From Swiss-Prot:
GO terms of molecular function: ATP binding; ATP-dependent protein folding chaperone; unfolded protein binding
Chain's role: Acts as a chaperone.
Descriptive protein name: Chaperone protein DnaK
Factors inducing expression: By stress conditions e.g. heat shock.
Encoding gene, per UniProt annotation: dnaK
Sorted UniProt keywords: ATP-binding, Chaperone, Nucleotide-binding, Phosphoprotein, Stress response
Extent of Low complexity compositional bias: 599-613
Length: 632
């Protein structure tokens, strides 16, 4: 059995790590970077992932997909998706099942299918490092992800060819990375995780007893639609509005210009973490009847902070709620860990420090901690990491809809998982022969205001007055936070159960089809790579042969030269096509046709040695002749 890798599947960047001895190691990708942009681009010939996809985004905005994690497990009609539709350069569309999917070149793609491309890149990165196949992974998700979003992440893993052994919450993973091997007896830490698209806050207690470490999540909260992308969007809106005031042109109508502004806004935001001001300079951003337009706007740190202060404030409000849920005061928090690239912003660090009355730790890498923690969890599951117990919680309350449209909670939020809970319900009408179990997730009393995870029917209930039948409903949450629900008629023993597959989720058939598509694409990608290699080889051989013809000169007879040049022309024509077999055949034909060239080159080399010797002798004679002449 191979290693279980740890993957931080991020909104903006992703990272992969693996246990190397007793320590987790972050693995560099093919480009030499420790993190990979979570960007996927579809071109005419191939699918690009990471930095190559990011580099061509400006020229291919409609088919370059980013921040897909914000769509995963979400309904098209949801407020968050409708907000994203207005600002994304690519087309978000409604799937047949009501999910938010993406339209690329006329094909509808599911977010798990797109995210699987990033996971495949992480898988390949690990395989290249380990020198062996990788089939198992621990993947992280925001702590505040609901069941549909967790299921969709597992689906993405399956499509990428990975058996997802565990889904682990990002703040919990960061705590594992921070606390593993610590000798402190008892400490309570706050993990503030503000990433590219999601925000989480978790209060975690780390205990050491007899050499065994226990990581217990006391409470968690957050917002799955708050992150660096939202900060970027505030800067983008500011730049576009300022340009419109100056030039009267709205850049939102130009996808290519919008992509340039997005890149510049992200760069400006990052620069303002260390500088007090920066200039956004985009020449030839657009043009009208009067000619080309240039964008040059100065952005100060103070302006950036004014644009995003409400976003930072909303994260601090979540801190207050989670501390209360954990039953802890600010003074009881020993350490604060900042995770996610957006926590590099000075305003974020300042507000967190003000809230806790102490500075956050600086010795945790905000980009890598989550992947390292996932790798540690992989080591725990594999048995390579001993004496570590992880106790996570469910982030949202779970229950069913009961009479009057009320949500009756069976499992409260922040309950340690895995867990199982049963409760007995009854019928609302006389002689009712069936009941519908509507499963909900959320904190609102009104059933319709919560997230619907799915519903099923329990039929065959014996006729009886209302309130008499006893229907036992059981919720079972596994260590991934994935839910199974069953309903049993205690009188007849009849039982109906479902593993919650939200109405918005992918069916097993769809996932299997996507797995097959991914495998087919992998084969197509391999063939394309082989074709490119054959073309490159053909180009190299043609160039080298031409050079040899020049060097051979008259040593190569005219007939042979004509045959070789014809073979070069045939090869160059084949290299422009897509038939690798033909390119290989024409390459071999050129090599064979070039045999006289090799013989001519050898003959010329041998002939070159003889004249060189003669020239040397002539030099000696001339010298002697001149010597005699002088003596006369």
């Amino acid at each position: 059995m191979g290693k279980i890798i740890g993957i931080d599947l991020g909104t903006t960047n992703s990272c992969v790590a693996v246990m190397d001895g007793d320590k987790a190691r972050v693995i560099e990708n093919a480009e030499g970077a420790r993190t990979t942009p979570s960007i996927i681009a579809y071109t005419d010939n191939e699918t690009l992932v990471g930095q190559p996809a990011k580099r061509q985004a400006i020229t291919n905005p409609k088919n370059t997909l980013f921040a897909i994690k914000r769509l995963i497990g979400r309904r098209f009609e949801s407020e968050e998706v409708q907000r994203d539709i207005k600002i994304m350069p690519f087309e978000i569309t409604r799937a047949d099942n009501g999910d938010a999917w993406v339209n690329v070149k006329g094909d509808k793609l599911a977010p798990p299918q797109i995210s699987a491309e990033v996971l495949k890149k992480m898988k390949k990165t690990a395989e290249d490092f380990l020198g062996e196949a990788v089939t198992e992974a621990v993947i992280t998700v925001p702590a505040y992800f609901n069941d549909a979003q967790r299921q969709a992440t597992i689906d993405a893993g399956r499509i990428a060819g990975l058996d997802v052994k565990r889904i682990i919450n990002e703040p919990t993973a960061a705590a594992l990375a921070f606390g593993l091997g610590s000798t402190k007896e008892n400490q309570v830490i706050a993990v503030y995780d503000l990433g590219g698209g999601t925000f989480d806050i978790s209060i975690i207690e780390i205990d050491n007893f007899d050499g065994e470490q226990t990581f217990e999540v006391l409470a968690t909260g957050g917002n799955t639609h708050l992150g660096g992308e939202d900060f970027d969007n505030r800067v983008i809106d500011y730049i576009i509005d300022e340009f419109k005031k100056e030039q009267g042109v709205d850049l939102r109508n130009d996808p290519m210009a919008l992509q340039r502004v997005k890149e510049a806004a992200e760069k400006a935001k990052i620069e303002l973490s260390s500088a007090q001001s920066t200039e956004v300079n985009l020449p030839y951003i657009t043009a009208d009847a009067t000619g080309p337009k240039h964008l040059a706007i100065n952005v100060t740190r103070a302006k950036l902070e004014a644009l995003v202060e409400d976003l930072v404030a909303s994260s601090i409000e979540s801190l207050k709620t989670v501390l209360k849920d954990a039953g802890k005061s600010v003074n009881e928090i020993n350490d604060i860990i900042l995770v996610g690239g957006q926590t590099r912003m000075p305003l974020v660090q300042q507000k967190v420090a003000e809230f806790f009355g102490k500075e956050a730790r600086k010795d945790v890498n905000p980009d890598e901690a989550v992947a390292i923690g996932a790798a540690v969890q992989g080591g725990v599951l594999k048995g390579d990491v001993k004496d570590v117990l992880l106790l996570d919680v469910t982030p949202l309350s779970l229950g069913i809809e009961t009479m009057g449209g009320v949500m009756t909670v069976l499992i409260e939020k922040n309950t340690t998982i895995p867990t199982k809970k049963s409760q007995v319900f009854s019928t609302a009408e006389d002689n009712q022969s069936a009941v519908t179990i509507h499963v909900l997730q959320g904190e609102r009393k009104q059933a319709s205001a919560n997230k619907s995870l799915g519903q099923f029917n329990l039929e065959g209930i014996n006729p009886a007055p209302r309130g008499m039948p006893q229907i036992e409903v059981t919720f079972d949450i596994d260590a991934n936070g994935v839910i199974n629900v069953s309903a049993k008629d205690k009188n007849t023993g009849k039982e109906q159960q479902i593993r919650i597959q939200a109405s918005s989720g992918l069916s097993d058939e769809e996932i299997e089809q996507m797995v097959r598509d991914a495998e087919a694409n992998a084969e197509a990608d391999k063939k394309f790579e082989e074709l490119v290699q054959a073309r490159n080889q053909a180009d190299g051989i043609a160039h080298a042969t031409r050079k040899q013809i020049e060097e051979a000169g008259d040593a190569l007879n005219a007939d042979d030269k004509a045959k070789i040049e014809a073979a070069i022309a045939d090869l160059e024509k084949a290299a422009k096509g897509d038939d690798k077999a033909e390119i290989d055949a024409k390459t071999e034909a050129l090599i064979k046709a070039s045999e006289p060239l090799m013989q001519a080159a050898q003959a010329k080399a041998q002939a070159g040695e003889q004249p060189q010797q003669s020239a040397k002798d002539d030099g000696v004679v001339d010298a002697e002749f001149e010597e005699v002449k002088d003596n006369k």
